[in-house]
Swiss-Prot record:
Pfam family, any one: tRNA_SAD
EC number: 6.1.1.7
Cofactor(s) required, per the database record: Zn(2+)
PANTHER family the UniProt entry points to: ALANINE--TRNA LIGASE, CYTOPLASMIC, ALANYL-TRNA SYNTHETASE
Catalytic reactions of this protein: tRNA(Ala) + L-alanine + ATP = L-alanyl-tRNA(Ala) + AMP + diphosphate
Organism lineage: Bacteria, Pseudomonadati, Pseudomonadota, Alphaproteobacteria, Hyphomicrobiales
InterPro entries: aa-tRNA-synth_II/BPL/LPL, Ala-tRNA-lgiase_IIc, Ala-tRNA-ligase_IIc_anticod-bd, Ala-tRNA-synth_IIc_core, Ala-tRNA-synth_IIc_N, Ala-tRNA_ligase, Ala_tRNA_ligase_euk/bac, DHHA1_dom
Domain notes: Consists of three domains; the N-terminal catalytic domain, the editing domain and the C-terminal C-Ala domain. The editing domain removes incorrectly charged amino acids, while the C-Ala domain, along with tRNA(Ala), serves as a bridge to cooperatively bring together the editing and aminoacylation centers thus stimulating deacylation of misacylated tRNAs.
Gene: alaS
Protein name per its UniProtKB record: Alanine--tRNA ligase
């Protein structure tokens, strides 16, 4: 029972048998805490439960939570690969009590699991407690039979946990194992506690206080439990190895890397194999949860992780992209526990392959610069932080990659100067994930949710209903009434108004009663499932307890339904045309348009867009029934229902099926398009009317966007396009069918005329005749040196060099200078010197003289041919005279 997968199952099943609900891991991108970059602990998804802002149907829970610590406050990136225990991605096993059992039961459950189920020996174990927590110490004596020397009292914050400056907090107790004298280190609290001999593997947090202010702490009415055990650490203990990288999971990933490289690790490069194995996990899980590499926020952290792994692959001799070729091994090991890996496998591979391909183009160049700039440094020296920033900013080298490359030489990077140069980018990155400061405003909604419960949504079946006002909010505070002319928010016990979510905008409409009219301008979800109607009282006054008639804007809702259903059709059509890697990244479903963002690494061609549009419209024309079914989430996924990456779903979900295959098959739903979706949809695909794609663009690296219209809007757009095409055909004196050929012929004719005009201008520039005899009349003799100098018109800079070469041949011996003025008044000049004179005159020197007159700075080229420019083309004549003066001087 020592394999990672078996350890995970044993832990979860043990707590399930002891009355705990097994709760799926939440995504790595926190849904309820914008101040966190990544989920880094098991309690994150339960934060609002602990604070009392959210209620769950259970009081005990157990999870295996995927976590990342590679950015922000918790950052283990630099240590990964070089220590026995640091990881960027890890699984935290945990059990939680929300006001149910407390210290004694928590300690008893932990002790029985590790000694009975996991078989750990008592004489190898010891624990820490907060120095004043006599209660916990007493329970350890009672339950485990520990003597005082096995219960170490710690007076620091290491054994007192707090959620923040205020809120739930309490002492904690950590469980350690002594791994033997062959490993350096001392017990916790000793001078050598940072060694690896005594390994902490489980932390039991006893939430028993509420930190009201800095100086005031009061007991919580319902104390809670939050525990966290590192799965990888426990695996190393049970498998009898000293490093997490020697456990079965990591050995399989390292073996896959060895197979791909054609060689195994050596003592010198073992760290690189470990880095690749760890970073493969964190990168893959982040991509599966919807994070893509970019230059800011979470995407930047992902890029740092990926590029660090790619750098180590390069150190191991990989000549081609490596990481994407290892994804299958990770899916094999962890796909059963985390099915999102299986669903996202193709997307992970494609994202990694393209990122590594991009990075390899600049890696060699950046490393060459790094080697050049650090060539004079020796062990103990400091590498300039400004240069490190240039490597990041210009070549995409994250700081940690630069540090990693210099680590083996014993050279450090000047972090202070790097940070100074990086401040703006860091601020921008933080802005993409830091909280917006709305927590105080949001508190009113959580308070109301606690008091009122969830709003009953009726909008799947009706657009009209009656409801009773249960709360009124104005300027972020509860009020007893809203008067005519006042804007605010109304909550009713039940509503047909759809609240904005899943990309679908909120409904608008009116709430009315005798002499009362409230115009709803938006409907939003607050505190999870509290439907809030925002708007203005146009007539009368609305008070708590009033009964209102609720009427959704029917025409607007109908248009939204069509656009939402069309989004599903386009999603499936994109997968058919472009591949299974297509995954939704976001959407907007509005009454007048829709847009759909998805993972794809290159622009979509017009032919591909046409195919996508045709496939979607074929389903529309079939006019099949749209089937909606409530299902268990696992059954829905088994039926092939597509889910939004990174989204957290409840135990029961709505499944929307479209297309000929949509039919009843007992507990499963099959269809041409099958998605988990809480939005509103048409009854039949024919109700969409028509789908018209109006645009395609890039949103971010690896993310594309299509925009489309449906129904009347699509028809109007198509009619407008046809009218424009007919008008164009009329102007071209052709038919619609023949217009493409007519346009091609006209474009060919235009190119021909442009070429002829260009040749004519060149001849005119060189004297006006094909023989070029007119040019000879412009030649001056300056001290025995022939100078051909002209200001020409209508000549592009790219043609000037050819004309100068032609002039040099005509002169035989001499200097030729041509100045052309562009439409915006800028001047360009090219100077040529025949081979026999380059020892006396440099074209570069002469062209710089002319450039100064034109208001330019310098110029460049070779002694026989050089060019320059300046903003003032009106001084072309004076520029030529400057060249003449230089020759005569």
């Amino acid at each position: 029972m020592s394999g990672v997968n078996e350890i995970r199952s044993t832990f979860l099943n043990y707590f399930a048998k002891n009355g705990h609900e097994i709760v799926s891991s939440s995504p790595l991108v926190p849904r309820n805490d914008p101040t966190l970059m990544f989920t880094n602990a098991g309690m994150v998804q339960f934060k609002n439960v602990f604070t009392g802002l959210e209620k769950r149907s259970y009081q005990r829970a157990t999870t295996s939570q995927k976590c990342v610590r590679a950015g922000g406050k918790h950052n283990d990136l630099d240590n990964v690969g070089y220590t026995a225990r640091h990881l960027t991605f890890f699984e935290m096993l945990g059990n939680f009590s929300f006001g149910d059992y407390f210290k004694e039961r928590a300690i008893e459950l932990a002790w029985n699991l590790i000694t009975r189920d996991f078989g750990l020996k008592k004489d190898k174990l010891l624990v820490t407690v907060y120095h004043t927590d006599d209660e916990a110490a007493g329970y350890w004596k009672k339950i485990a039979g520990f003597s005082d020397d096995r219960i170490i009292r710690i007076p620091t914050s290491d054994n007192f946990w707090a959620m923040g400056d205020t809120g739930p907090c309490g002492p904690c107790s950590e469980i350690f194992i002594d791994r033997g004298e062959h490993i350096f280190g001392g017990p916790p609290g000793s001078p050598d506690e940072d060694g690896d001999r005594f390994l902490e593997f489980w932390n039991l947090v006893f939430m028993q206080y509420d930190q009201v202010t800095k100086d005031e702490r009061v007991p919580l009415p319902r104390p809670s439990i939050d525990t966290g055990m590192g799965l990888e650490r426990m695996a190393s203990i049970l498998q009898g190895v000293d490093s997490v990288f020697d456990t079965d999971l990591f050995r399989s990933l390292i073996d896959a890397t060895s197979s791909a490289l054609g060689r195994g690790p050596t003592e010198q490069d073992a760290a690189s194999f470990r880095v690749i194995a760890d970073h493969l996990r964190s990168s893959s899980f982040l991509i599966a949860d919807g994070v893509l590499p970019s230059n800011e926020g979470r995407g930047y952290v992902l890029r740092r992780i990926m590029r660090r792994a790619m750098r180590h692959a390069q150190l191991l001799g990989a000549s081609e992209p490596l990481m994407w070729r290892l994804v299958w091994a990770l899916v094999r090991e962890m796909g059963q526990a985390y099915p999102e890996l299986v669903r996202a496998e193709a997307m992970i591979e494609e994202t990694m392959r393209l990122e590594e391909t991009r990075f390899r183009k600049t890696l060699d160049r950046g490393l060459a610069i790094l080697d050049e700039k650090s060539a004079g440094l020796k062990k103990g020296d400091m590498f300039d932080g400004e240069t490190a920033f240039t490597l990041y900013d210009t070549y995409g080298f994250p700081l940690d990659l630069t540090q990693d490359a210099l680590r083996n030489r014993g050279i450090n990077v000047d972090i202070a100067s790097f940070t100074d140069a990086m401040d703006r980018q860091r601020a921008k990155a933080r802005a993409s994930w830091a909280g917006s400061g709305e927590a105080a405003t949001e508190a009113v909604w959580f308070s109301l949710r606690e008091k009122l419960g969830a709003t009953e949504f009726l909008g799947y079946d009706t657009e009209t209903a009656e409801g009773v006002v249960t709360a009124l909010v104005k300027d972020g505070a509860e009020v007893d009434a809203l008067k005519a002319g006042e804007s605010g928010a109304i909550i009713v016990n039940q509503t047909p108004f759809y609240a904005e979510s899943g990309g679908q905008v909120g409904d608008t409409g009116v709430l009315t009663a005798d002499g009362v009219r409230f115009v709803v301008t938006d409907t939003m979800k607050k505190a999870g499932d509290l439907f809030v109607h925002f708007g203005t009282v146009e007539q009368g006054s609305i008070k708590l307890g009033d009964a209102l008639a609720l009427d959704v804007d029917h025409a607007r809702r109908s248009a939204i339904r069509a656009n939402h259903s069309a989004t599903h059709l386009l999603h499936e059509a994109l997968r058919q045309v472009l591949g299974d890697h297509i995954a939704q990244k976001g959407s907007l479903v509005a009454p007048d348009r829709l847009r759909f963002d998805f993972v794809h690494q290159k622009p979509i061609t017009q032919d591909e867009l046409r195919k996508v549009e045709d496939i979607a419209n074929d389903i529309v024309l079939e006019n099949d029934e749209v089937v909606t079914r409530l299902m268990a989430v696992d059954d829905a996924r088994e039926a092939g229902a597509r889910a939004l990456f990174g989204e957290k779903y409840g135990d029961e979900v709505r499944v929307v099926s479209m297309g000929k295959a949509a039919r009843d098959h007992g507990s499963n739903v099959f269809g041409w398009s099958v998605e988990l979706c809480g939005g509103t949809h048409v009854k039949r695909t024919g109700d969409i009317g028509l789908v018209s794609i109006t645009g395609e663009s890039a949103v971010a690296a690896g993310v594309r966007r299509i925009e489309a219209l449906t129904g009347r809007a699509a028809r109007h757009n198509a009619n407008a396009a046809i009218s424009t095409a007919k008008l164009a055909a009329s102007e071209l004196r052709t038919t619609l069918d023949d217009m493409p050929a007519r346009i091609t012929a006209l474009m060919d004719e235009r190119k021909k005329l442009e070429r002829e005009l260009s040749e004519a201008r060149k001849k005119l520039a060189m004297g006006g005749s094909a023989a070029g005899d007119g040019a000879a009349s412009d030649v001056r003799d300056i001290g025995g040196i022939k100078l051909m100098a002209r200001a020409v018109e209508g000549i592009e800079i790219k043609d000037l060099k050819g004309l100068v070469d032609q002039g040099k041949k005509q002169l035989g011996s001499g200097v030729i200078a041509l100045v052309a003025t562009s439409e915006d008044g800028k001047g360009s000049i090219v100077v040529g010197v025949t081979p026999d004179l380059v020892s006396r005159f440099s074209a570069v020197d002469l062209v710089r003289k002319a450039s100064e007159v034109l208001g330019g700075k310098g110029g460049g080229g070779k002694p026989d041919m050089a060019q320059a420019g300046g903003p003032d083309g009106s001084k072309a004549g004076a520029a030529l005279e400057a060249i003449a003066a230089a020759i005569g001087g």
